[in-house]
């Protein structure tokens, strides 16, 4: 007997009601788009069957081309052919020029110091270039799926900061795409491998792409993907292998002129071809700029050995953060085209003591994971139990009195997350509070990074400590931060979304974490000193107000004792002796106890004046 299947409105899984979603791997060197079709995940090819789209855009006055056609124009029109734009996302022009001094583009700075690339199509920023790549991928998906996309999941390196993530979302919006979520690339790979092989335990995802390196330590258990720790370098990848090999070929060929962009591109193309060939062969013949020679795999390995070692040092730091040893790692997932280099696979295998997983094409695995996640988020799998937990790389907090940082969300907290903490006013009658949002691991403001400032006004004028302000930090699934401050009694509030124009480099993040450990003892002492100084200032300010109001309650001798104690506290508070300040505060408290009792009695008498015992 046939059964009639009934679904709630909007939740039908009928094929014609499926929403169209895609996962996009927006890579430094190549990009891909993937989708789930008929229950199967697949990357979508172009008309010629090519799945990879080179992340290259060639601009002309009358328009632009993306992908292979653009890459083919690179040698003839270098200044108008933009590649590896992902490296520029969220960075200042000064940072880009310091990191990549030989880029063949004509740069100009925007009013806030961000890069603008001068092309035949006009001045373009990295967001616009990225948007053109995303448009090409979206067009491929729409044509293949015979419809417009309802949403996309776009992957980003795990170490991308707020500015880089926001830039990626802006590029997607410019391309007309609805972003369901930004997803860390290693996490996307874990989704792909987790569903394919059903592994449970600690997994390391080693992601070496064209321009970025990420290492993530994840725990997979019962459908839950939890990122224990992340690390990496957003300015290290296969492109660096290419440039090292290109420089080596230049030396061998005796080419001294670096100003000829056409020769620069020819050298780079020869280096890329040689690198690919050396993954399968021990030697390769190179013919460039009239020079012919031979490059061996051993020579190539010598050139890149130091860079591979840098990736392994990042792996060691991530393992330490996660609290696991290399032998605790169940599997090592290899992601990114650069993991095809034999030396990389060999060194990674030696480090972790096991053969890395390469079952899924390392170029496609991230896009596959993103497509699976997009299919879930768009609503095609409402019953999915997969839970995804990412982490923030650095602690978030607020500046408090004395230049201290009060951490609200510690680093490696899983996101999305919201945490609230209550603060109070420092002075009598205070009606406004400045909120200074900080990022970092140190105890003092001067050693952390300022993210944003905003003010909460309209606080009721109460005695110091009388008003209560709740500050809420919220980090969404894309790693973007918003902060809200609200005075509890009135409900007055102010908020800000943190969107810095450009953010921290991975080296700076790693340095901040390292410094927090190196200076831990020193920072604790500095914090204790600052806290005692703040308390001393509070005590002295309260005492001044009390003496102004009720000095008549004291005899001359009593007033002198209090003045002496206050003067001593004021003097020692200028120094660095924590114990001396603490003792001076206790002495002021001792000398003012009788004064405080008399003030209390006086307040009670005033409150009861004119009232009978029965009324009380």
Curated annotation (Swiss-Prot):
PROSITE patterns per the UniProt record, alphabetical: HSP70_1 (PS00297), HSP70_2 (PS00329), HSP70_3 (PS01036)
UniProt entry keywords in alphabetical sequence: ATP-binding, Chaperone, Nucleotide-binding
Pfam families: HSP70
Name of the protein in question: Chaperone protein HscA
Keyword DNA-binding: no
Record GO biological process: iron-sulfur cluster assembly
Organism annotation: Salmonella agona (strain SL483)
Family to which the UniProt record says this protein belongs: Belongs to the heat shock protein 70 family.
Listed InterPro entries: ATPase_NBD, Heat_shock_70_CS, HscA_NBD, HSP70_C_sf, HSP70_peptide-bd_sf, Hsp_70_fam, ISC_FeS_clus_asmbl_HscA
Key word Nucleotide-binding present: yes
Signal peptide limits: none
Main function: Chaperone involved in the maturation of iron-sulfur cluster-containing proteins. Has a low intrinsic ATPase activity which is markedly stimulated by HscB. Involved in the maturation of IscU.
GO MF terms held by the record: ATP binding; ATP hydrolysis activity; ATP-dependent protein folding chaperone; unfolded protein binding
